Amino acid sequence: MGRSSKSVRLLAGVITLVAVLVAPTAVSGAAPSGPTGGSAAARWAASHDGPQPHAGVNVSWDVPIRMSDGTVLRANVYRPADARERPTSTKTPVIVNMTPYTKLVSSIGSAVTQHPVLEPFLLQLARSINLSGTPIDGINDIAHTIRDGGAKTFLVDFDLVRSGYTQVVVDVRGTGFSQGKWDVFQDREQRDTVEVIDWASKQRWSNGKVGMSGVSYSAINQIQAANKNPKALKAIFPVEPGGDLIRDIVAPGGALGVGFLPLWLTLVNTTKMIPNVASMLNGTFDWKWLADRIADPLTFYPQLLAGLFTPDIASVPPELKELLETDSEPRTAWLDRAENITTPTFIYGGWFDLFTNSEVRMYNKIPLPPGKKQLIMGDGYHLTIGGGQQGRAGSPPRLDVLQKAWFDKWLKGIDNGIDSYGPVNLKQVGDSWITARQFPRAGMERQRLYLSDRRSGTAPYAVRDGSLTPTAPQSRARMTVAPGLAPVCSRDAAQQMAGALAIFPGCSDDARISERAALTFTTPPLTTTRSVSGYSNVRLNTVLDATDGYWTATLNDVAPDGTSKVITSGQVVASLRGYDRATSQFAPNGDVIDPFYNLTLSTRQRVAPGRPVSIDIGLLPTEAIVKPGHRLRVDVFAMNFPRGLPLRPLLNESGLRPQHIQLDPNRPSFVNLPVSTPIG
């Protein structure tokens, strides 16, 4: 009896010891749950926000990095340090950020937003800003990028550095304090990025493992570096990356991106002229830098001006012509080639970002297993990184938290569960966040909804109020729409201007103003909830009075009170309607659902005035919920300024004449949608 009792006590002791030893491991290994990441995300946040092994940050300013052609780039190097800013002697992983916006901006922004006194004040200010219900309540989302961690992915994250990383911020060639001519993502600039990665891996403070971080431009060059698979590059965290710059922002659908390009080019070409004042004071001014700036003061402006002012096709200059041919050096350099990437990649994008066209394509092309590649798609704009939602209840963790967890996994080998997150987290337009295995989500059915001239009674203010029906109309009708400026107040305008116009929600959140220049086609109220997940296409049977025209279509969610919110949109210049069948996607019935436009002069197809021509308008991919009582609507416009403006020769050929949809039972006009349950 005594021996038995002793055995029981011994067994109980062993079980208790095992429980004590195993329990922390079990908790730390708990898999992330849903979009929020569950308890795993709480540990990621604690790892980022809690006490760090290093108290300070040591900065080396304007470190020279010589490229293989002799050009010198300049970098700021941020290293973990003690409280007196003495750098650690321990070798660390390195995070590289290549920026065209001058590292001066990054250093000032980081110093202000992460100052020990100013940071709490700014965070509290961001939390306290609430302009909801005012004409400028879109400012809320911009302010919340500080709270949501988006700002730290653009700037330098001092918490990340103090946790044991070195961050290197480099002015790309021809910008900031770096020598050379700004190459705008082309081959020489891409080679620079690879050489910087190699340089960073071999410094005395580096352990040889390199990651990359950054937003927008600094996300695109991450993708470009990763597709070359440099040996030292172990992980990337691109926020809002583009993968096909012609189709994303330069000329989506063949229309010049006038709402974004002039302002962006002016920003970079202006800031690259800011001299290194410190070098002027200490006698080390770089005269080669000055000579390079004088030689190339307005990079890419000749192409922009040619697109705006060249009167006809015969007069198109070489610098513009090369952008309008598939095999030209810029066009090939601007493709993501994500199918070559083997580096763990975490992509953050948005349904109303500048680069929505590319973000999900990129994720799907990367030949890595889910987990080693991750995708988050929010519903914010380019400037509202995180959309004011990250870190809130029901939403993914803050971006700075996710970024550190990603680097901890792939650069430090910490088994924190980030590779079990997602792999695809999607903000459903009109609803909440969901986690999926893929995008588009499985289980969608393709459905045609046909454009009809029968009045829906929901848009009396539109040019024409039509219906959207599950069966094709049996009568013929012609509906005419003329180019107009109402889309200046629209979600497309807000999207093209990176979200700057979204501070006025009356334009971005309700399409009824822009619909005054549109033909609208609306369903009856839905009786059950429908999901829309994937690519949609609007097929129009058109007639033009000129040899060219410009078509835009949007898919909208119309609430019972009449509010019309754009879910997704697309556009195409009529003569550039041709698409590459090998790259485009098709529905089982043969309908094109994702036309990959050629956008070249050599494949241009002028329209015969007065003759019907079928036009396919591919809409950007989306994930949306349409609730009972709401309606779906297709809007059709003949102009979409400032989202786009046809190249001047094509605009001149259009004459800005009215454009017609010819409704014909033999050549129906329709939208092909990916829906959870057929409508009607």
Language-model regions, residue ranges each:
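Alpha/beta-hydrolase fold nucleophile elbow
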Residues: R204-S216
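C-terminal, loop-rich substrate-recognition/catalytic regions characterized by aromatic stacking residues
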Residues: S47, R392-G680
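Short beta-strand/loop motif that positions the catalytic acidic residue
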Residues: I341, I347-G349
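Secretory targeting and sorting signals
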Residues: G2-A31
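N-terminal cap/lid segment of alpha/beta-hydrolase-fold proteins
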Residues: A46-T90, L526-T528
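Accessory cap/linker subdomain of secreted extracellular hydrolases
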Residues: A46-H48, P100-R162, N227-I341
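Alpha/beta-hydrolase active-site loop
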Residues: A151-K152, R162, V184-Q203
